[in-house]
Regions:
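Chitinase-like catalytic core of GlcNAc-active glycosidases
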Residues: 1-188, 192, 196-218
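Short, low-complexity, polybasic intrinsically disordered segments
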Residues: 215-233
């Protein structure tokens, strides 16, 4: 997220600069160790708290530089853009973000390094919200080669009407979203094959008790959800 005092400087949670995280959290060393053991990382920008960079950094060049500094420091091959709250309907920041990320992605491609880009967005049992559909469309329009859309499959109901079957609600959200994503690409002149549609989707449930009382996503739900893509064409 953005540094609270310097809106075009990336930070970890608004509390640590990249250098601070290397010194105080030994983050760079830990990443090196993980990769030496065969693992890798993906950095997610944004989230429920604080300010995503594009929402407060209004200069295109400075915004691209902010994303670039994170991608290059950690030699990232994939990033996630977790867009929530008012950001999801804020057209200026959506368009700025797309331009900046597209710039960095193109630079990486020119250097022979792929940069996968995911969007993480709120969802209901009907799939993406209207704002979510518009955001995905605008991101692609802005030049981003989008790897996929990750649905936040959680908190489906309300205090008065909690969702009793969280697995069914999650599956319904994904079934709806796969059609929405296919429609978005069709509008771009790209016809996704059935085998491609599900590769464009991810899901992030809230394991256990959700924020809505009465909604619990169990370990059995998680096991069942893990095999859903395998059941699709």
């Amino acid at each position: 997220v953005a540094d609270p005092d310097e809106p075009c400087d990336p930070s970890w949670g608004g509390a640590y600069s990249l250098d601070d995280a290397a010194r105080d959290l030994e983050l760079d060393r830990r990443i090196t160790q993980l990769r030496a053991a065969g693992g890798d990382i993906m950095v997610s920008f944004g989230g429920q708290a604080n300010s995503e960079l594009a929402f407060v950094c209004t200069d295109d060049a400075d915004l691209a530089s902010a994303y670039r500094s994170v991608v290059e420091r950690y030699d990232l091959h994939a990033i996630d853009l977790d867009i929530e709250n008012a950001d999801i309907a804020d057209t200026p920041s959506i368009e700025r973000r797309a331009r900046a990320v597209a710039t960095v992605q193109a630079e990486r491609a020119a250097a022979g390094d792929e940069l996968d880009v995911w969007l993480t967005l709120p969802a209901s049992r009907s799939g993406l919200t209207d704002d979510g559909v518009a955001l995905v469309t605008a991101t692609i329009d802005g030049g981003v080669d989008l790897t996929g859309v990750n649905l936040m499959t959680m908190n489906f109901g309300s205090a008065d009407e909690p969702t009793s079957d969280m697995l069914a609600a999650t599956k319904a959200a994904l079934e709806a979203a796969v059609g929405q994503v296919a429609d978005i690409y069709r509008g771009q002149g790209v016809a996704l094959a059935d085998s491609e549609r599900w590769t464009k989707l991810g899901a992030t449930p809230m394991i256990g008790q959700n924020d809505v009382i009465g909604e619990v996503f169990t370990l059995d739900d998680a096991k069942a959800l893990a095999v859903v893509p395998a059941d699709k064409p």
